């Protein structure tokens, strides 16, 4: 029996091309997150402040969720996040995100009944349960043109977040965030290697 294992090789893709592609896409996503993180960090008034460090991690998670949600169809249509933010120049991105996060955290029946009249694009966003957007005390810094371009062009237009492997990307994403703040903020992720040992 030990010598006949080769007969089952057709069941396993020895080249692991699919896994390698997932890994590369996830690494590319991690690189984008790292660039966004670094640009955001430069905008904080006191980046060493504990609240600022926790905020940048929360903001990074929220932005990545929105990028993934628009590509994976969670928001209802492709490019919804992108289309909403393109309405605003860099100077107004901060307030646009604050409003968006508030809407994502509010059940549709609890929203301002005139929201669709005031901002139809914003009103289209669904409610996202789970508390990801519930912390209104998050510090969101001002955006620069470079940061706006990085988010809208590089991370939204030029990248398909629905192609990432959540298992692989989780480990990559976590490694881009400040390790000390991750421990304080309770962020945990099980790597792909850990899953294979279960």
Would you name each region that the model predicts?
Residues 198:
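Conserved phosphate-binding elements of NTP-dependent enzyme cores
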Residues 4-195:
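Preference for the N-terminal adenyl/adenosyl cofactor-binding alpha/beta module
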């Amino acid at each position: 029996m030990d010598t006949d294992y080769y007969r089952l090789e057709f069941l396993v893709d020895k080249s692991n091309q699919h896994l390698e592609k997932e890994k590369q896409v996830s690494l590319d996503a991690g690189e984008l997150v790292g660039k966004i993180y670094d640009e955001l960090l430069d905008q904080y008034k006191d980046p060493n402040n504990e609240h600022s460090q926790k905020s940048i991690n929360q903001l990074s998670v929220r932005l990545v969720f929105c990028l993934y949600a628009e590509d994976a169809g969670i928001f209802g249509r492709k490019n919804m996040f992108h289309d909403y933010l393109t309405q605003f120049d860099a100077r107004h991105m901060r307030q646009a995100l604050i409003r968006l996060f508030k809407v994502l955290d509010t059940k549709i029946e609890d929203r301002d009944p005139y929201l669709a009249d005031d901002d139809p694009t914003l009103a289209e966003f669904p409610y996202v349960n789970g508390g990801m957007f519930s912390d209104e005390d998050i510090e969101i810094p001002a955006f620069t043109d470079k940061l706006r371009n990085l988010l809208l062009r590089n991370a939204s237009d030029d990248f398909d977040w629905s192609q990432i492997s959540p298992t692989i990307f989780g480990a990559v994403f976590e490694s881009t965030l400040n390790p000390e703040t991750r421990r304080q903020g309770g962020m945990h992720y099980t790597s792909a290697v850990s899953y294979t040992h279960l």
